[in-house]
Curated annotation (Swiss-Prot):
It comes from Arabidopsis thaliana. Pfam families: F-box, FBA_3. This is Putative F-box protein At5g50220. NCBIfam families: F_box_assoc_1. InterPro entries: F-box-assoc_dom_typ3, F-box-assoc_interact_dom, F-box-like_dom_sf, F-box_dom. Disulfide bonds: none annotated. PROSITE patterns: FBOX. Residues 27-73 form the F-box domain. PANTHER family: BNAA05G37150D PROTEIN-RELATED (PTHR31111), F-BOX DOMAIN-CONTAINING PROTEIN (PTHR31111:SF58). It comes from the Eukaryota.
Length: 357
């Protein structure tokens, strides 16, 4: 019996590890897939699969997360698909919960999130890769409250974070994502007396936002992401009497008021003249409790609840101003048994982007 067991043991014993290593190398060499063909195969895969496949090898990780041509192809593919909305809910019972503080640019690939209640610590977040990057402190420090905008330079293909000091320092800093220096740059800012208001909107490389000086009316300011210069935009006086919501309305800057009425103004695409036209006005109460997420390419306005109990059903509403019609879409998988108040944070028109932060 002992002899027989020894014979069986010899027959079932594993092969040496070195033999397996040689075999793996030979299989890879036998396949011999050209790098160009491999890249084309990867481009056909869903973004979720690409994020997982980054751990296959350093080469795959570099292609998926760092190759400019590959990332652009993923963005282009996502843009050709029907637009999608991502809704992120944050519990108000958690003191250290993240909150969205900027969603300015049209290509919804990245967001700025604040890490604390005083909005002094911010991070860039990529919903596709679920990766975040903490922003360094500015030279002014974090002893005061600041406002951050996220913009996109379409010519240099760069993302930039603009940080405005809201109080005494009256300065502005710019952080370029992907810059090897990883430091803030101080630039000239001549509108320090105005308090910037969120959310902004970025259209064709220009960030637009409303601002207010204490005891005065509102103003409309803009920041050119390419030249990194600020300017004031002329707007009708009736629009500056109270706060509006800025939207990208079919490629044009839009002002929308939703209090006891629905009012939409659109700025004409004319660099020499800043002319506005009121495209819709309708008396309707009840819209003040909603959050304006965006405008669809067809001109529909997307609304979501500002606050909601976790046990309640979450709905997204699409309002068509031209037909004065409303449709409702239920969001599944958002209800919880435990009751607590949640803050709804919409990420409109999300575009997949595998860029590594």
């Amino acid at each position: 019996m002992k002899r027989g067991s020894e014979e069986i043991k010899e027959e079932t014993s594993p092969l040496p590890a070195k033999h397996f290593q040689r075999r793996e190398v030979s299989i890879a060499e036998d396949i011999g897939i050209p790098i160009d063909l491999m890249v084309e195969i990867l481009k056909k895969l869903p973004a979720k699969s690409l994020i997982k496949f980054q751990c296959v090898s350093k080469q795959w990780s570099s292609i998926i997360g760092s190759s400019r041509d590959f990332i652009d192809s993923i963005v282009t593919r996502s843009l050709s698909q029907p637009s999608r909305d991502i809704l992120i809910s944050f519990s108000t019972t958690l003191t250290n919960s993240l909150k969205q503080i900027s969603s300015s640019f049209p290509l919804r690939t990245l967001d700025i999130l604040t890490k604390n209640q005083s909005y002094t610590e911010a991070a860039i977040y990529n919903p596709t890769t679920r990766q975040s990057l903490s922003l360094p402190e500015t030279t002014a420090g974090h002893s005061h409250v600041s406002t951050s905008f996220l913009g996109y330079d379409p010519f240099k293909n760069q993302y930039k974070v603009i940080c405005l000091d809201n109080y005494k320092r009256r300065c502005c800093h710019v952080f370029t994502l992907g810059d090897a220096i990883r430091k803030w740059r101080k630039i000239q800012y001549n509108f320090g007396l105005y308090f910037p208001l969120l959310p902004p909107v970025c259209i064709k490389g220009t960030i637009y936002y409303q601002a207010k000086q204490y005891g005065s009316t509102y103003v409309l300011l803009c920041f050119d992401v390419i030249s990194e210069k600020f300017d004031q935009v002329e707007a009708p006086k009736t629009m500056m009497d109270h706060r509006y919501t800025l939207i990208n309305y079919q490629g044009k800057l839009g002002f929308m008021c939703c209090q006891n009425r629905v009012e939409i103004w659109v700025m004409k695409n004319d660099e020499k003249k800043q002319e506005w036209s009121k495209i819709f006005f309708y008396e309707m109460a009840g819209f003040e409790k909603w959050h304006i997420a965006r405008a669809t390419p067809s001109g529909e306005i997307v609304f979501v609840n500002r606050l909601l109990l976790s046990c309640q059903t979450l709905y997204v509403y699409y309002y068509g101003p031209k037909r004065n019609s409303m449709r409702r879409v239920e969001v599944e998988g958002t209800k919880y048994r435990r009751k607590h108040l949640v803050h709804i944070c919409p990420v409109p028109d999300h575009v997949e982007n595998t860029m590594r932060l």
